[in-house]
Design a protein with these regions (language model features):
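Conserved beta-propeller blade repeats
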Residues: 1, 19-38, 64-82, 108-123, ...
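Beta-propeller blade-edge and WD-like acidic-aromatic loop motif
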Residues: 1-16, 34, 38-59, 77-78, ...
Length: 177
């Protein structure tokens, strides 16, 4: 089972935040007040948030298919995530209350894990060359790509390489962008 836990960097007891499983942590709001995560409830994986101190979980998405990889934008205005709601894994964003869901990528790649630059103008993501459905396995042909937030244009940062699960699951920007 997968739950989300919290502990102090100084040590001490570990506190469980989520009461249902599976729950997969992905991000913390810029003000540290909320966590955002992917969880399976009622047979579907959707995006949830809750207070960083625990409490009631708030469902932010409810689409058929996998919603995963949620991450707050540095300005705290949006939550970016990947979704299979169109039949292809693409990058989406929504306001932090779950409203105004907007598709950000529209290509034939399977796009995962958008990580927003500190200046909120672009995002790096991993793209599988061949459609992987609702999976993000390791050991596949992938590229790192850059999404322009304003124009929604995506450009290659790398040529294809052997990677996948674990390549860029967490935020990896330099604080200066």
């Amino acid at each position: 089972n997968s739950f989300i836990y919290k502990t102090s960097l100084k040590g001490g007891p570990t506190e469980i935040l989520t009461t249902e499983s599976p729950s997969y942590w992905h991000g913390v709001s810029p003000d540290n007040k909320f966590i955002v995560y992917c969880a399976e409830r009622e047979g579907n994986y959707d995006i949830y948030k809750m207070s960083s101190n625990g409490g009631k979980e708030i469902r932010l998405s409810n689409a058929k298919g996998l919603d995963d990889g949620p991450e707050y934008s540095p300005d705290g205005k949006y939550i970016y995530f990947n979704s299979y709601r169109t039949g292809k894994m693409q990058i989406w964003r929504m306001f932090t209350d779950g409203s105004n869901k907007e598709q950000m990528t529209f290509d034939n790649y399977s796009n995962w894990f958008a990580h927003i630059a500190p200046h909120n103008e672009s995002a790096v993501l991993i793209s599988y060359i061949k459609d992987q459905g609702q999976r993000h396995p390791f050991g596949r042909s992938v590229k790192l790509r850059l999404l322009d937030i304003e124009t929604k244009e995506v450009s290659d940062l790398t040529s294809s390489f052997f990677g996948g699960q674990g390549t860029i699951n967490v935020h990896s920007w330099n604080p200066e962008g």
